[in-house]
Amino acid sequence: MSVDAVGGAVEGAPARLALRVQYLGGHFFGWQWQPGQRTVQQCLEEATERIARHPVRYHAAGRTDTGVHASGQVVHFDTHKKLAPETWVRGLNSLLPDDIAVRAAAYVSDHWHARFTALWREYRYCIHNSTVPDLFVRAQSWYYPYCPLDSEAVAAALATLPGHHDFRAFRRAGSSRPHSLVHVYTAECTREGEQIAIRVRANSFLYGMMRLLIGALAEVGSGRWSVERFAGLWQAGNREQVKYAAPPQGLCLVGVGYPDDPFKTNGIGFARCHTGQEKPEARLGNGDLESREERPPHEMSPLH
């Protein structure tokens, strides 16, 4: 695949476009298409097909579950539509619902894959540890009023995770993955006032892994489990003792790493937007999008 002066794909074989996207997961039934349900993949594909005028299929670095957010999800699709990356960004954002945003776009090689080329994913889990709720953080955190959580004990428990290990203790039933080996690169806990943030970076994540992990860490933070018990349970693969999953709204996919960041050199920047330098064929005309008004700037639960 080759690219013209404005970043649009040269006519011929389909081009592959990578996007960095954000979404608020509260009103989605996860990333992946589900018949009769509202999903992130469905919304992106429907908006893209209105521009491309042909069917598209999206692939994501991480297939987030119902209620889980993303601030740094990376996806890709193939298209014959010849548009500059910044034109794709503007066009998609004009069609997408308010709880999805495209933040960057870049053309990549035909061999690049949002999921399989990725080196790591990073998730953040936020806990609002207070006796009084805060409505402005509750939608993106786990409100935990039951007792003060010891963030230092949580950090000590997280320190047992880095390395290449079998994390079957944190795998939810129903996974089709043939093994439960994961390489954790970093795992840390920070606290600022009432807000606790737990971040884990790994080459991949098991089905339900982060929410089960947070449920176990809450046991440590509350003092019900020692750090030694936590480490012993997961190292022994004792799934029966990890009974609860933290709620989904505190979880967010914050980043995905690649050998070469496609958005660093080819992604759009604010300075490139609305420069008036696009070639005519790279602009969106009235026939490319349906008429639309321009937008102004602008508790733990049992696991089954």
From Swiss-Prot:
Active site location: 65 (nucleophile)
Reaction(s) catalysed by this chain's protein: uridine(38/39/40) in tRNA = pseudouridine(38/39/40) in tRNA
Biased composition (Basic and acidic residues): 289-298
Annotated EC: 5.4.99.12
Example GO BP: tRNA pseudouridine synthesis
EC primary class: isomerase
Tagged with keyword rRNA-binding: no
Pfam families: PseudoU_synth_1 (PF01416)
Entry keywords, A to Z: Isomerase, tRNA processing
MF (Gene Ontology): pseudouridine synthase activity; RNA binding; tRNA pseudouridine(38-40) synthase activity
Residue numbers spanned by region Disordered: 274-304
Binding positions for substrate per the UniProt entry: 123
UniProt keyword annotation of Flavoprotein present: no
Assembly mode: Homodimer.
Family designation: Belongs to the tRNA pseudouridine synthase TruA family.
PANTHER family in the record: PSEUDOURIDYLATE SYNTHASE (PTHR11142), TRNA PSEUDOURIDINE SYNTHASE-LIKE 1 (PTHR11142:SF0)
Functional description taken from the UniProt entry: Formation of pseudouridine at positions 38, 39 and 40 in the anticodon stem and loop of transfer RNAs.
Protein name in the entry: tRNA pseudouridine synthase A
Source lineage: Bacteria, Bacillati, Cyanobacteriota, Cyanophyceae, Gloeobacterales
